[in-house]
Amino acid sequence: MTFYNHKEIEPKWQDFWAKNHTFKTGTDSSKPKFYALDMFPYPSGAGLHVGHPEGYTATDILSRFKRAQGYNVLHPMGWDAFGLPAEQYAMDTGNDPADFTAENIANFKRQINSLGFSYDWDREVNTTDPNYYKWTQWIFTKLYEKGLAYEAEVPVNWVEELGTAIANEEVLPDGTSERGGYPVVRKPMRQWMLKITAYAERLLEDLEEVDWPESIKDMQRNWIGKSVGANITFNVKDSEESFTVFTTRPDTLFGATYAVLAPEHALVDAITTEEQAEAIAEYKRQASLKSDLARTDLAKEKTGVWTGAYAINPVNGKEMPIWIADYVLSSYGTGAIMAVPAHDERDWEFAKQFHLDIIPVLEGGNVQEAAYTEDGLHINSDFLDGLNKEEAIAKTVAWLEEKEVGNEKVSYRLRDWLFSRQRYWGEPIPIIHWEDGTSTAVPEDQLPLILPVTKDIHPSGTGESPLANITDWLEVTREDGVKGRRETNTMPQWAGSSWYYLRYIDPKNDKAIADPDLLKQWLPVDIYVGGAEHAVLHLLYARFWHKVLYDLGVVPTKEPFQKLFNQGMILGTSYRDHRGALVATDKVEKREGSYFHIETGEELEQAPAKMSKSLKNVVNPDDVVEQYGADTLRVYEMFMGPLDASIAWSEEGLEGSRKFLDRVYRLITTKEMTGDNSGALDKVYHETVKAVTEQIESMKFNTAIAQLMIFVNAANKEDKLYKEQAKGFVQLIAPFAPHLGEELWQVLTDSNQSISHVAWPTWDENKLVENDVEIVVQIKGKVKAKLVLAKDLSKEELEAAALSHEKIQAEIAGKEIVKVIAVPNKLVNIVVK
């Protein structure tokens, strides 16, 4: 039986594409542009897994489709190659992280090429290449000049095992590090911060301009966390000191019965009484060991210590005890809250635990039993009594401003971006600290500041990076003899990925990030495909940098990525025992269609789960390509289900996709071709062209493949195939199965040209219309027959056809026809007696 020999055909066309630079980015300025971007991978030692090609195949189908439609297509690939894993490996083995990274990139590239993706490799970027990170450093110097990069002594999320601080976004809900799962503690350190908060409002507003999944927009909105309220000043009793509180509910000020400061608040030591000093110091020490997430966990028991001091409530002059508690963060708002326990669950729990006053100021509920958090008219609130929420907020803010003890305020949950890492394998931060106390950026003509090669990349132990150990690199002298030290912190992995999509546009430019005319031509990115896990990290950081570059006049658009699509996760096959515990696949055997634990004999339930080394259910694409071919993997991953759904991997599904490609191969290579069109396949062919075109546009790849299958089934029923329709069909399947597409195009055309730039087929709407219709024939309103007749017959023709039908003649034999009602294209009703 004829079948598709992938082991021969796929390498042949991969060589052809490489030699002929088939996918070189078009530069014809008369053509429209299409920029299709994948989230570039971190080149890990493990190589690609089958989850990577899902998103890559989607952008590849779009890229091939758009080329055929006459677009200039920019479809690049590169490497996000700085980061902790390579450094950790280097520390464990003594090898250079650069060598390890280069080996991993070579392996990734081999795997990617084996899958037939149409990348323009002339535009490859690598974040660890000095010619690339020169511009990462240049962007940093611009941030520094604009006051958007600054140093601060801040409590950081310190991970002892990693020897570095990590960003809030990299701390997991259980208070451990995203990488490695190590304990995270709070520790004050000198750090570089980026002022992303200066762009909070624009980052929020401009989400309206982009075509992104609403779920991702919501995650960014929540992360930015805009809230409108008021700042209120509280004086400390018997003291010159005061502190400010931000609240979204200034109207509940009459119900504020105590205040809470973050343990790190600058005022704590100044107002603490002698009697409370020891307890306060111990509490501060314990709080410093916890991450922000652990401190704000709603389920944890409320803890706190009274400072011994009181604040004066400005609206009624009442004394409010001032406490410290770790659920208040110094980094959020002002680091101080006014507690209204009657109407806030956390404040209520705290008040109950420490026997503090609870005064209701809104109607409804029993505040001795639980906090009342619904809205209601105001009570116990003097000039606010009887007002609703909106009226009371407006009146309170006016009162605060009149008395000069507060003002309306917009606050954001978003914090500035902790940008420094105490590691070796990252971009050096181009700053020099001079002994006269000043700091300067490395001048542009001295960039890139090269990361020095060293064998000793262990953390310095002082909290500085290993670069602090390399004195000949570290120490510099100015022309006037003033000595200085280079910045020893390096940038986080997020730095290089915050602007890489710009470098693809002009990757060899040594005078600028990219030529301004080329940036104008290619931006914004038309489609960006990647995982939803990057919603508030990479995607927010890239938008921030893009807006800074927009303000500098470097880029012409406000937003980098016009359309974002998150592919789903490909789950592995896994097995659960009666307790719900997962069992590794090498401990499972299949008997008579059921699955059993090899060691215990227990019958197991098959269940999809995330692929992981521990479950031994990771599928390596190399194995799939070897056994089934790259085109099979591509078609299978697109046919599994909707692109954004999470779906379990299935060998049976893979085999089904392979069989389909074999049927396609047989159809084109063995069916007799003809130059005469019988018209038999016109309708299904034009339906297929239309459906596949529209479904690729809308990224419904699974339904596009289903339509291709419908055409193959119909074509197999015919003795001959109209050659032009066969060619059109091969063009339709080529973006999904490009090696097969090229091979069959060659079979049909005897051409040695690639199918890649052949114009996309078009459909004829007239051919989609049915020429025949089904006519229902009724006698006295009851259906007696259904006739297939030519469309648009006259009433007389319909009547004649109905009355001459043998079944109808038998029904009306011996009866008198009273009248015949004919409705064109629908029915004939015969009335008899």
UniProtKB/Swiss-Prot annotation:
PROSITE patterns: AA_TRNA_LIGASE_I
Motif ('HIGH' region): 41-52
InterPro entries registered for this protein in UniProt: aa-tRNA-synth_I_CS (IPR001412), aa-tRNA-synth_Ia (IPR002300), Leu-tRNA-ligase (IPR002302), Leu_tRNA-synth_edit (IPR025709), M/V/L/I-tRNA-synth_anticd-bd (IPR013155), Methionyl/Leucyl_tRNA_Synth (IPR015413), Rossmann-like_a/b/a_fold (IPR014729), tRNAsynth_Ia_anticodon-bd (IPR009080)
Catalytic activity: tRNA(Leu) + L-leucine + ATP = L-leucyl-tRNA(Leu) + AMP + diphosphate
Record key words, sorted: Aminoacyl-tRNA synthetase, ATP-binding, Cytoplasm, Ligase, Nucleotide-binding, Protein biosynthesis
Annotated GO biological process: leucyl-tRNA aminoacylation
Major subcellular site: cytoplasm
The enzyme's E.C. designation: 6.1.1.4
Residues engaged in binding ATP: 613
Coiled-coil features, chain-numbered ranges: none
Disulfide bonds: none
Cell cycle recorded as keyword: no
Gene Ontology molecular functions: aminoacyl-tRNA deacylase activity; ATP binding; leucine-tRNA ligase activity
Enzyme class: ligase
This protein's GO CC annotations: cytosol
Record family assignment: Belongs to the class-I aminoacyl-tRNA synthetase family.
Entry-linked NCBIfam families: leuS_bact
Protein name in the entry: Leucine--tRNA ligase
Biological source species: Streptococcus uberis (strain ATCC BAA-854 / 0140J)
Organism ancestry: Bacteria, Bacillati, Bacillota, Bacilli, Lactobacillales
